[in-house]
Amino acid sequence: MRILLKIWRQASAKVPGEFVDYTVDPVSPDMSFLEMLDVLNETLIANKQDPVAFDSDCREGICGACGFLVNGIAHGPDPGTTVCQLHMRRFSEGDRIILEPWRAKAFPIIKDLVVDRSAFDRIIQAGGYTSVNVGGAQDANAILIPKATVEKAMDSAACIACGACVAACKNASAVLFTSAKVSHLALLPQGQIERRARVVAMLDQHDAEGFGSCSNE
């Protein structure tokens, strides 16, 4: 099938960007979305044009490296998946797809669809860890923890820091990311001792990075 793309192109955060139109044909419905972009880039390179920059690594929805807006939706139309898990069977012949990077002050554009998410790293460095009794790792079953607690902690630990929550939030808040990291440590015995100081330190860093405030309005 034939797919029309409108992609945000920007050389860096210091220069203005613009949307550029591309056509990819043929596109197999069995391709992943990123494989379709690979095909586009192969064509651009063959024509001695600059390929579209985008992040990816595992391409299995695990690492959190990939991510951009697909028709204004973080990671695209399929719920609970990353953009690398999106497949072209989700689209139809002649569809026009608009691709943009995460839009947030705290995520400056590096190039095209690639943004700098190191602000997340600095939030973790501010307190997203345990520094108490970490000299020797105990056996996993040495500390008994209720299964329900473990499940809740694992749900929070499953956050892959992709940045989609920031992109989806009108205030560009990273409170969902920060709270996930706070929760997965605070729920477990190892993280109890520093839980209060951890929250304050991580939220202070969150605000210092320029993320917006969370709102329930």
PLM region descriptions:
Residues 31-50, 95-217:
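Ferredoxin-type iron-sulfur electron-transfer modules in oxidoreductases and energy-metabolism complexes
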Residues 20-32:
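Short, contiguous acidic and Ser/Thr-rich linear segments
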Residues 53-65:
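Short, structured protein-protein interaction patches enriched in aromatics and acidic/basic residues
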Residues 49-50, 65, 69:
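Long, hydrophobic/aromatic-enriched structural stretches that serve as scaffold segments
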Residues 70-92, 99:
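Glycine-rich phosphate/adenylate-binding loop and adjacent beta-alpha elements
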Residues 1-23:
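Eukaryote-biased recognition of intrinsically disordered, low-complexity regulatory segments
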